[in-house]
């Protein structure tokens, strides 16, 4: 079964766009993958389009050969958006291969070790604060944060992850200088930030109650000194983990050894080579792996390495429903799994765009058992929601 063509489709996803790769075969089987250009990775589509000619005509079943060949051709610029393009191609090949064999994708990964995957409600409060016209009800005060914490518990979810907010006149504003909002390239953490972190976490805990696990995302928003200040300031909170990305494995290991809470990291890394320094340094308690970026087959090699270093993993997943299903198969086949990320706040038209949407039971995602990834984008629905211009991080305005 040969690859006959690759096509990129896009649609409006509120503050960003959804991106899909459609891979057709000479047997009329269609393989799908979801990728992203909104999280600091403009140009993935161009990579896929440039490499497509090297993929067409090759055997779908030879996805490891295809990936390795494409890696060889792009070796001088490996990683980055090039690596994400390779991951998107690999994931579409896996979907087509599984459909040809009439099996779920987790079978290709060694079979599932669980039927359900525990998830945490990610960007809890974040989307409702940053994008109040898209995600309802908008959060404009600490009372809104408390109400959302209660909503998480009442909907049966057992864990949530939130971000940092500054409360000016009682109204929250996102604080993410690592991503240019506000533009503070020195990444210093002052007393106002420390007070506001505590205020926000206390409100979330008050609403969610004592039994919901609380996670905090600090990724790239401080330097080593600042991370240690925040960890010290929230030492008395019961945290499931604090998420910290650092370019230095040694710095992260130093932070972890002083942290009162478990540390998770590495969601932006591509390929096993980039993970190894962090494993060797014992720099994190949980390794976060992006199977959308890496390609799920390649991600499994990172899973196996993590196991050798006694580290559990968590899939990075804040995309559309296809990516969630891709990660569900990834998580289902991973023995050393900690938990999986998912965005529960969705756009009004999300369910229109996919043939099947994720199903949850008691805070767990039910792993689909139909061939392939278990869902597909609906092309007519994609056309009904045309993509906007620059989406994602590039769309944010400097305050």
Name the predicted role of every residue range.
Residues 116, 120-255:
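Metal-dependent enolase-superfamily TIM-barrel catalytic cores that perform enediolate-based chemistry
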Residues 26-101:
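Metal- or metallocofactor-binding catalytic centers and their adjacent structured scaffolds
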Residues 1-14, 103-117:
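N-terminal amphipathic alpha-helix/helix-capping segment at the start of soluble metabolic enzymes
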Residues 373-399:
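Extended hydrophobic packing segments that form well-structured cores
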Residues 1-36, 346-353:
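Structured beta-strand/loop patches that form or line metal/cofactor-binding pockets in enzymes
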Residues 21, 26-27, 32, 100-103, ...:
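Ligand-binding pocket scaffold of soluble enzyme catalytic domains
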Residues 46, 51-53, 65, 232-241, ...:
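Shared catalytic-loop signature of beta/alpha-barrel
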Residues 3, 28, 51, 89, ...:
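Conserved, mostly hydrophobic/aromatic
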